[in-house]
Amino acid sequence: MFVGEYYHSLDEKGRLIVPNNFRQLLGETFYLTRGFERCLNIYTITDWNNFSEIISSFSPTDDLMRRLCRFWFSGSVQVTTDKLGRILIPSFLIDYAELYKDVVIIGAGRHIEIWAKERWEEFNKEENILESMKEINEKVSELWKR
C-alpha cells in the first residue's frame, strides 16, 4: 500500500524525484496517467494491466466506457526511474495537472497521486474535507456491514 505525503519540486526539464519508499514498491518501471481531479496517478505494472484489462473488456458500443478508454490510454505513459530515482513527466501531463514547480506526491492506497501544491492545498481545505467525510463515512460503514 502506498501511504504518506511528500513535497518536492519539478526541475526545469520536468523531472521529479519519486520517494524512495514508493520506488521500492513500484520497481524501476511503472505507469503514469491522468487522474480524475487534475492530478496524475502512478500505477504498478500489475495494477495498470489489471485495470486496463477490465476497462477494455466492456462493449465497444458503450459510449461511457469508450470515453474512459480514451481518457485512460491516451493520457498514459510508461516511465522508468533514472539512477537518481527521477522520472521525466511529459509536457502534456505537466500541463494537464498544472505541475509547474512545487508538487505533492501522496500515497493513495493502491496507487500514487501527484498534485500541484496549490491544488492539493485547496482540495484539502478543512471545510472541503469535513463536508466530504460524512458522505464517505456512510459509504464505508455500509461496506463494513456486509
UniProtKB/Swiss-Prot annotation:
One of its GO terms (biological process) is negative regulation of DNA-templated transcription initiation. Forms oligomers. It comes from Dictyoglomus turgidum (strain DSM 6724 / Z-1310). It holds the Pfam family MraZ. The keyword Phosphoprotein does not apply. Residues 5-47, 76-119 form the SpoVT-AbrB domain. This is Transcriptional regulator MraZ. Belongs to the MraZ family.
